[in-house]
Amino acid sequence: MFLCVRILKRKYHELSSFQKLLIFTITIFLLWVLGVVDKFRETSFGDFSWPLETRNLQLRSKFTKYPQCKFSGNGQKIIIIIIKSSAKNGPMRESVRKTWGVFRMIDGVEVMPIFIVGRVENMEIMRRIDVESEKYKDILAISDIDSYRNNTLKLFGAIDYAANPNQCSSPDFTFLVDDDYLVHIPNLVKFAKTKQKEELVYEGFVFDTSPFRLKIHKHSISLNEYPFSRYPPYVSAGAVFLTSETIARFRNSIRKLKMFPFDDVFTGILAKTVNVAATHNENFIFWCRRVSQKEWDDGVIAVHGYARKDLEYEYSQLNGFE
C-alpha cells in the first residue's frame, strides 16, 4: 500500500502544471456533483428554524372543480380520503373506484374518497377530466400544473379542502393517499375508531433522513433551498393519517411558511413548526412488496406500489373487504 502511494506521488510530481490544475478542477467538480462540498457547508439541524414567507395564498380560489358531498350525516365519525392522482392517471382512478374506493359506510363510520388532480397542458386530458368529474363527481381540481415538484401545492389544496369541505360536513379524520396504494378500508376504519378528532395525530410510515445533495438525484436539494444537515421526521406523503385538530393547525400555519418542493418533507417541517409529532405506524407499508393475508388480517392499512392490474387482482384475492 505504502509503495503504491509513493509511486502515485512520483507520477503526480512528473505532471505538468496544466495537468495538475486539470486534475484539481475535475476533483473539485466531482466533489460538487456528489454533494460532498455542500455536506461540509450544511447548518446543524440543532439550529433548525423555518422562515416565514409573506404571500397572498388564497387556496380556495385555485380550485377549479369540487367533488359532490356524499356524506349522509348518519355516521358516528367521518373520514375523507383525498387521493393524490396525476391528471393523466384516469385508468388508475377507475381501478380505485371499483376496488377499495367503493366504500361509503362501514361499522358506523362514513368514508368519502375523492381525487385531487392538477392541470396539464394536454387539452384532451383536461377534457377527459371534465367528463370524469361530471360522471363521478369525485374530482377536486387545482389550477396549478401537475408535476412532481408541485405536489406541495396539492398538499395545500388537500389540507384547505379537508379543513372546510365545500357544502359538506367537516370530517373527523383525513387520509391523504397516492393512487398507487391499496387501502384496506375496514382496517383504516378500525384504526380511526381508536382516535379522537381533538387529538394531534400525524401518522404513517416515518422517515428520519438527511437531504440529498447529489446534483443528479431526483430528490437533490440545494443549500439555498434547505441549509440544514437533517430533515425533521416526516411521514411518507404516500399515506398520511390526520385528525381534524391537526388539519386545523396545519392550515393555520401553511400559508405563512416558506414553500418547499417535496410535500412529505414540507409536512414534516410544518409539523415541527406547530409541535405535532410524526408517529410511525408499521401498518402503513411504504416499500413495494407482497403482503400476506395474515398481515392484512393483523391490521395492515395501506400498501404502496400497485399498478392498475395488480391492484385489481390483489383486491380480488383479499378476504375481509366485504
Swiss-Prot record:
Enzyme Commission no: 2.4.1.-
GO cellular component, one term: Golgi membrane
One GO MF term: acetylglucosaminyltransferase activity
Subcellular location: Golgi apparatus membrane
Domain of life per record: Eukaryota
Membrane topology classification: Single-pass type II membrane protein
Lumenal side: 38-322
Pathway given in the UniProt record: Protein modification; protein glycosylation
Residues with glycosylation annotation: N150
Tissue expression pattern: Expressed in the gut.
All ranges on the Cytoplasmic side of the membrane: 1-16
Mutant phenotype after disruption: Worms exhibit resistance to the Cry5B and Cry14A toxins produced by Bacillus thuringiensis. This is thought to be due to mutants having reduced population of glycolipids which are targeted by the Cry proteins.
Keywords: Glycoprotein, Glycosyltransferase, Golgi apparatus, Insecticide resistance, Membrane, Signal-anchor, Transferase, Transmembrane, Transmembrane helix
InterPro entries linked: Glyco_trans_31
TM spans (from-to): 17-37
Principal location: Golgi
GO biological process: carbohydrate biosynthetic process; positive regulation of Notch signaling pathway; protein O-linked glycosylation; regulation of mesodermal cell fate specification; response to toxic substance
Keyword check for Transmembrane: yes
Family statement drawn from the similarity comment of this UniProt entry: Belongs to the glycosyltransferase 31 family.
Role: Transfers N-acetylgalactosamine onto mannose groups of carbohydrate substrates. Required for susceptibility to pore-forming crystal toxins in conjunction with bre-1, bre-2, bre-3, and bre-4. Involved in resistance to the nematotoxic C.cinerea galectin Cgl2.
Name assigned to this protein: Beta-1,3-galactosyltransferase bre-5
